[in-house]
């Protein structure tokens, strides 16, 4: 017998220890029968919230199912503990900025913070029952990972996929680093559309509307549409920039929108991506007036060396400007503004402050002819939230644009769950217009294994580290054959995605067959079987991982990708610390327990955003309670650890429940093979509540007790109850691992319910279509009897003098076994089958008319 009440806290503590000690989730290390999961390493950027638990549970459902199916599961946990997200956490923790404390001290601070955060993450992931093999834990800042990440870079560089170039890039002036296209979010911001009066050399006034008037000092051309009749006479002429008097060409280009603003556009270097396009297409000069701090810097245009745009390291030393390979050679133009009022008033101001000042100056001079408040989309950094600038700097890139078609082919080779997410990836790839910028001007990340030569005759030559010397830090180490005076180290670090994009290879301990660590398992687990992730990182993690696997090995990184939706807060927005709408998991786990939280996460369909719901948690709690109580009831009729058998099942309604169970096993298995955990749980839960608890337990219990029935009928009920409960526990085990383990241990075996090969096999059952149909008719009649009793305000146990049933056809009449159970469950003294009965309730399918005589 089970205890009266189920204590989830006691049980969770017990099995967290037992599972780890018994190594039930340990990967055996053999290629045969291995199922490899590429898991998302949580970013060390703060505390985990319930939204993180949401997606990690989805992966665990599949891991537990595949393990019980008989697979040897390779299920690692990683921690993404390098890069900008971690740096921001450290800066917030210590209330300082990286540059204020210096590189070495800041890196020490990073290690201190991530160690504490990792322990908190581990405790939380364990507390919700994620079945990782903790011996496979990895970290994106570990020696092994840095080695593999640097191997990846060297392989890509040698193959011509990685290159360094000076070009306009997206710049975050708060975090003071380049970022990639995938790290942008478009925000709708309030602004103003300002109309500025320019003139031509012939003194004709022309109006240009812009949201960035502070950039007019960097104007290098004026554009109109070639079919705009208003300005056809201006094409080929020269415009004069107001205040500073600089002359710029007026050029026709089809990318001008005739109906936007005044139809004239000033090209400034750089306000947006269109400015980049025009500057490069028409070979226009560059006038850079915004610096890396996001301030107006008019002095920079007098610096012919352009040092701040040639890869300054964070210490202020030029670290990578010597490189000439692949660099563009823009011609710069000087703006004659020194010793003028406009220079004095705006130089050194932040961009938004300068914008206000410029509008004021233009208004005072009568050069602002209009200003309209608008809302428009602004490109912002995903992490810092700040508006991005476009600055020309030296950066490292990985090619994407010239490989779109090939990567799209790889995307189509992969199985996407749900399939609609593949289209999202395809749209992203087709819309790419930048190569992937992988260098970051930060401290805490994987260093580029690169130096630049100062030797005479090879100035600027890229020197790669030898593979056998990896990992290297160019700031501390030297390349073979060079002295300190002969090289300049690359001071940048890699974008954290550049490392996270090789998580399948990190698990394999090899980038490909050429670049590997000792004792690698590349041939055993690469490519992986499954990648599980949420949909917002399709354009980053999924895309970059597919790209790198293609470049490194012409392979997919995994065969299947399962994409979860977001967990939304009550306001239907994604949970995030910045929005202040996060829900911490600890309080929910303390209130409901891990199984109930897991139940809530399983009630979300793949790829669909789900609002956090206390109501679903309450339903989950009722399920856990009902499972315990139903098991407690069944345990009355069985000996502990008795053999589970159905070889003596003889009664129709027992065969009915087993036939229903056959279908549920089939449906749940097929759903989980397609990674549809929500549908699988729904099928099992529906069977448990409706078929097993509401119906079968009631009709079988008197036979199970042995009241006025044959020993044969009694044994049939006991075997069926014992077998069905055992199977229900195993079907629910991936979702509710704790309570199913506790009941299974108490009643069925001292082995774990989660053991490999313990998934129910429908072939153990014989599907009996006749018994299922007979049982369904039984249930139609029983439901009408229950309704009649309810309509007469009597309990379901109220004695019936006579139960009268009319069947439309003789073949629908219940057999004697089913009639015996019907008479018992309805508490009827007798059942009369009548061909003449007209009054009574009719079943939905019209097969039966039912009436009763009550005492």
From Swiss-Prot:
The keyword Protein biosynthesis applies. The keyword rRNA-binding does not apply. It comes from the Bacteria. A motif ('KMSKS' region) lies at residues 574-578. It is an enzyme of class 6 (ligase). SUPFAM superfamilies: Anticodon-binding domain of a subclass of class I aminoacyl-tRNA synthetases, Nucleotidylyl transferase, ValRS/IleRS/LeuRS editing domain. GO terms for biological process: valyl-tRNA aminoacylation. It catalyses: tRNA(Val) + L-valine + ATP = L-valyl-tRNA(Val) + AMP + diphosphate. It holds the Pfam family Anticodon_1. A motif ('HIGH' region) lies at residues 42-52. One of its GO terms (cellular component) is cytosol. InterPro entries: aa-tRNA-synth_I_CS (IPR001412), aa-tRNA-synth_Ia (IPR002300), Anticodon_Ia_Val (IPR033705), M/V/L/I-tRNA-synth_anticd-bd (IPR013155), Rossmann-like_a/b/a_fold (IPR014729), tRNAsynth_Ia_anticodon-bd (IPR009080), Val/Leu/Ile-tRNA-synth_edit (IPR009008), Valine-tRNA_ligase_type_2 (IPR022874). PANTHER family: VALINE--TRNA LIGASE, CHLOROPLASTIC_MITOCHONDRIAL 2, VALYL-TRNA SYNTHETASES. ValRS has two distinct active sites: one for aminoacylation and one for editing. The misactivated threonine is translocated from the active site to the editing site. Monomer. This is Valine--tRNA ligase. It comes from Wolbachia sp. subsp. Brugia malayi (strain TRS). The gene is valS.
